[in-house]
């Protein structure tokens, strides 16, 4: 199954830092939707990555990261960390949905005013709880610059315990490797 393959890959990446039972729970909780491999034509296949809760391929990475971060918060006895993400759509939706309700984590989604689809804007502005959406009068690059400047501010980082949910965070992009191993395994069966 996708979950079994993903667990094996995750164990290779994180096995020394996360106990087996917790890692398995993180992986299985992350992957609660199908990622079918579809034969498009002859020897051409497509892995459909739009079956997650926000219909974005980033759902896997965001959901995995949220659960992994939640695990480390508990393990290290931290009270709260703050996640910053700049978005023009997909990242904000996937991160907001993936982190919704995760204890000890507050997410701030920065997005450019009028430059995000209405559907995606609704996906991260209507959740409440531990998700705060901040509409920025500017471009995606302006949002990204604000996030980067927050990380450059040592006092702010110390006080708020900041991390990023953009693709610079290894916990967000490494789970995308699950796709390749799963697709290869499915092709071997075909």
Name what the model sees in each region.
Residues 1-190:
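PLP-dependent amino-acid enzyme catalytic core
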